[in-house]
Structure formats: structure tokens, C-alpha cells
């Protein structure tokens, strides 16, 4: 057997071992009497996340039926556990005079700082221009750390509308900002199903779609199509996804579904550190260009969006000079290929 065959067999064995381990953890988590924070719950989810974070060649979309069923069940369990965890810490924070002074009590707060830095860096690079004035976050939950970090560290002049289907989650979230004059003035919490939000979407410069809003691929595709119908042309969409084994924790979003929803996909970024979510930056397509009277082709037809999308991995936050040079080189290569 050649070297290539040995490597292939090793990869298959590693993937099978990983799926087997995650299947066992999913079974153990499914047998827990409660997903509220406890030593047992925390230990199992810590082991699960630790198993899924390292770079992996596993393709969750290519799993067999049993593994796919396990994965779908596990993502729902992760969503429930995340909701319990956020509600628990939201209540703890609300007991303080100014909850926003104590956000570091949340054990994964640093992950949100890094994810928000990454998302803002990608937005600034791929959607240049004035800073967003109005931002919507869809699926903000009882502990809206993403909005809070973005507002405090990256978008100090923007207003944020946070949408969640749960009125209880929004009540918890609103308690956190009441004592802070700045956040209280810029943060609004709206209880609604995303599919029912229509005309309001026209007013946002950026819309963030949380990873767990639309957990099934078909549901996510419908939501993206809904956003494509109602967002303003030129507005940015930030979609959280997952890659590799991290797809056992969160849904994987196909960039092609975002294109079909009426968006130009600008970049896809897969972190390889403790930031679990991949990030897709897209922009609502402008209205079709006018058709010249004496020709059968549109005037100033833009190049198809799918030709120039860059899929990138760290540098985190896209802030370092090396990352910037590499990204520019990717763009130059893409343009050369399109012109060839």
C-alpha cells in the first residue's frame, strides 16, 4: 500500500473514532435529567466541545443516516443547554447594581470578545464605508453578549434591535441594560418570530443571524430567503455557521443557500482557535441593472458573485499585516482567474 493509501486509511479511522466518541457523548447528554448548569452537565459539554474544536477533515453532511440523526439531536441538546446556561448567568448578572460591569463572570465571555472582533474585522474589510448606524441581531437570547460587545467595543454609535422568539429571554436581556444609560438608550429587545419580521428589516445596515436560528438546513434557507426579500439593497448580512467537527455543535450553512436567498457572498471564514463559529459575510444584492435598448445584455453587468469569494482561516479578527497581505493576494488571484 502506498503512502497515499496509508494516509487515507488513517484519516478514515480518525474520523470514525471521532464520530464514535461524539455518539457516546450525545447518548450520555441525552440521558441527563436536566440540561441546567451542574458539574455533570458542564463536564459532558466541556468534553464534547474539546473533542470538536481541533481541525478535522470530517464532513458532517456526508455522514450516514444514523450519524445524521444523532447530529441533529445533539445540536438541539446543545441549543437547549446553551439557553439554560445563558439564562442562569443572566439571572446572576441581574443581581448586581450594574450587570454590564460583571460580564466577565460568564465563563465564555472571552470567546464572545474574539468572535465579535472577528465579525467586525470582516465587516470592515469586506463592506467598507460609513460605520453601521442600525443593527439587528436575530436570536439574541437571554444574555445578548454579541450585541453588548459589538456596541461597547466596535460600534459605539450604532443602535441595536435584538430579536428573540422568547419573551422571557427578552425580559432577562432587558434587565441587564436598564442600569446603563448608554446601552439602555441604544439597545431594544423585540419579541418576534424572524419569519414575521418584514418591513423593519429594510431599516438595518447590518443584520446578524445567530447560529441557532433555523437549526435545520431547510429552515435556515427559508430564513435567508425571507431576509433577502425584505432587507435593503446593499445591507450586510452576517451568518454564523460551523466547519468540520464543529458541525456537531452548530448547524452548517452552505454559502450557496445564501446566494440563492438574494445575497452576494463576500467571504467565508473558518476559525481554528476556541472561537467555534464560522462567519459568512454577505451583502443584499442590488436591484438588477437596466437593460440597454439596443442590446440583449444588462448595462454594466457585475461579475457573478460566486467567482470571487474568498474562504479564509485565521488571522483572528483579520487585523494583522500578514493576514491583510494574504487576503489581498487571494483577491488578485481571483481577479486574474476571472479575466483569463
UniProtKB/Swiss-Prot annotation:
Leader sequence segment: none
EC nos: 2.5.1.43
Catalytic activity: 3 S-adenosyl-L-methionine = nicotianamine + 3 S-methyl-5'-thioadenosine + 3 H(+)
Induction comment: Fivefold increase after iron deficiency.
Enzyme class: transferase
InterPro entries xrefs: Nicotian_synth, SAM-dependent_MTases_sf
Top-rank lineage group of the source organism: Eukaryota
GO BP term, example: nicotianamine biosynthetic process
Entry keyword annotation includes Transport: no
Single GO MF annotation: nicotianamine synthase activity
Key words, A-Z: S-adenosyl-L-methionine, Transferase
PROSITE patterns, A to Z: NAS (PS51142)
Subunit structure, as described in the record: Homotrimer.
Family label: Belongs to the nicotianamine synthase (NAS)-like family.
Function: Synthesizes nicotianamine, a polyamine that is the first intermediate in the synthesis of the phytosiderophores of the mugineic acid type found in gramineae which serves as a sensor for the physiological iron status within the plant, and/or might be involved in the transport of iron.
UniProt cross-references to PANTHER family, sorted A to Z: NICOTIANAMINE SYNTHASE 3
Protein name, per record: Nicotianamine synthase 9
Organism: Hordeum vulgare (Barley)
